[in-house]
Amino acid sequence: MNITDEDLSKLKFHLNEVAKIKSKLGGCYTQYIFRRSTVDPIVVEFISNYLRKSDLYDQAHFFNLSIDSVKVGQKLPIKLVNFMNKFDFADEMRVSIDLEDLKTVSLVIEFDDEMVVKQLSIEIDE
């Protein structure tokens, strides 16, 4: 599914709203799932655990700020590049939110070796 500017705005807004609620509850935003092009469950588990235990300043704020500045044809924000370099990510980053009706909506950011964003897309898993 190709992403329009309107779709992207809606998804970013929703991510920010979920993040605000989670930060009020004192929990970090564990729905961020980073993955390689082929999913390695161990990698996903490792990242999830890292985020749960991390003492990063307000993860929800950190990632949402970064996601707001992701644009096709531009380099990934330095905060995201630095985070991903710690874990040797390949060419894709995925931000997922689980909705109440058991659907998972993901913003998929694909980038090249120079960390320039090649494509933004939305995937919905039911």
Label each residue range with its predicted role.
Residues 96:
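Phosphate/anion-contacting hairpin/loop surfaces
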